[in-house]
From Swiss-Prot:
Protein name per Swiss-Prot or TrEMBL: Cytochrome c biogenesis protein CcsA
UniProt membrane topology term: Multi-pass membrane protein
Record keyword Chloroplast present: yes
GO MF terms, alphabetically ordered: heme binding
Subunit details: May interact with Ccs1.
The organism's place on the tree of life at top rank: Eukaryota
Purpose of the protein: Required during biogenesis of c-type cytochromes (cytochrome c6 and cytochrome f) at the step of heme attachment.
Keywords: Chloroplast, Cytochrome c-type biogenesis, Membrane, Plastid, Thylakoid, Transmembrane, Transmembrane helix
Family annotation (InterPro entries): Cyt_c_assembly, Cyt_c_biogenesis_CcsA, Cyt_c_biogenesis_CcsA/CcmC
Membrane-spanning residues: 17-37, 41-61, 77-97, 103-123, 148-168, 214-234, 241-261, 275-295
Pfam family, one: Cytochrom_C_asm
Family designation: Belongs to the CcmF/CycK/Ccl1/NrfE/CcsA family.
Length: 306
């Protein structure tokens, strides 16, 4: 009977995971169709439905593990990927509700889709199984520290991807800023406007502002996550900072986005230069989250690839 229940629970989890991935994949296609055919509002509504469905199923998967095993499911790579996928979809829905712009979904849905695909189809099955918590993780700081860090990653990834999109769309165009931080066109030596399409200019301005706002929201979460991690480390290992690879790259991530926010204050750095910094931050976030774990070294290497 116990084996039967375990198999049934595994099948339900597997179905929920597959449906979540399919929903996110469909939403990604729908968002791209909305970009291609702006007047087809049906695609946008259906995309919202699919993202909401995936979000609810991810809540179920996380809540089930939490209730069954009596600790919040953030103890290994698989569980953190589920939580990151949920964070991405939740933040996407909140930002779309707040800013009313389809570009957010078009950017966020591919990340959440690929993140969930990695957890579902690329991680070996043994890494998806629940294992007993090591003593250092048996703390209330597990929920506080890891969840806040992953939420910050979700915001920073979406914001930095928008900056990358800004760079792709603005290449070969010279852009200036007004006093209100709005993009304006620049002219060449013949006084011919480099950027002639006013709609494209408005689009670039929207993307740039969205990126700035979202990264501005994610940075405080990253700061709180690092501070809470330092406090937890002192309780668990007797030291606030050990220059562990994960700690070091978290600090590098913080510095990169601090530089980005500082460049937004300096008018000469706004636009493409600040977007380059944010684009570099996109890579650094993934190195901090996944890349460091391939080393298999340090205090944060448990429950990951080795």
């Amino acid at each position: 009977m116990l084996t039967l229940n375990m198999n049934l629970n595994y099948q339900i989890d597997n179905y929920c995971l597959n449906i979540s991935f399919l929903s996110l994949f469909i939403s990604m296609i729908c968002y791209w169709l909305v970009i291609a055919f702006p007047k087809k509002i049906f695609f946008l509504k259906f995309a919202h439905f699919e993202v909401s469905l995936a979000n609810i199923l991810l809540v179920y998967l996380l809540a089930y593990r939490w209730l069954k095993y009596s600790y919040f499911p953030l103890s290994n790579l698989y569980e953190s990927l589920l939580f990151l996928s949920w964070s991405l979809t939740t933040i996407q829905l909140i930002l779309e509700f707040k800013f009313k712009h389809k570009l957010i979904g078009a950017i966020a849905s591919p990340i959440s889709t690929l993140t969930l695909a990695f957890s579902s189809f690329f991680l070996p099955k043994y890494m998806q199984e629940v294992s007993p918590l090591i003593p250092a993780l048996k703390s209330n700081w597990l929920l506080m520290h890891v969840s806040v860090i992953l939420i910050s990653y979700a915001m920073l990834l979406i914001g930095s991807l928008l900056s990358i999109l800004f760079l792709l769309l603005s290449r070969n165009n010279k852009l200036n800023y007004t006093k209100n931080n709005n993009l304006t066109t620049a002219s060449n030596s013949n006084d011919t406007l480099i950027l002639k399409n006013e709609d494209k200019l408005n689009l670039l301005n929207t993307i740039d502002n969205l990126s700035y706002r979202i990264i501005g929201l994610g940075f405080p979460f990253l700061t709180i996550g690092i501070i809470s991690g330092a406090v937890w480390a002192n309780e668990a290992w007797g030291s606030y900072w050990s220059w562990d690879p994960k700690e070091t790259w978290a600090l590098i991530t913080w510095i990169i986005f601090a530089i980005y926010l500082h460049t937004r204050i300096n008018k000469s750095w706004q636009g493409k230069k600040s977007a380059i910094v944010a684009g570099f931050g996109f890579v650094v976030v993934w190195i901090c989250y996944l890349g460091v774990n391939f080393l298999g070294k340090g205090l944060h290497s448990y429950g990951w690839f080795l």
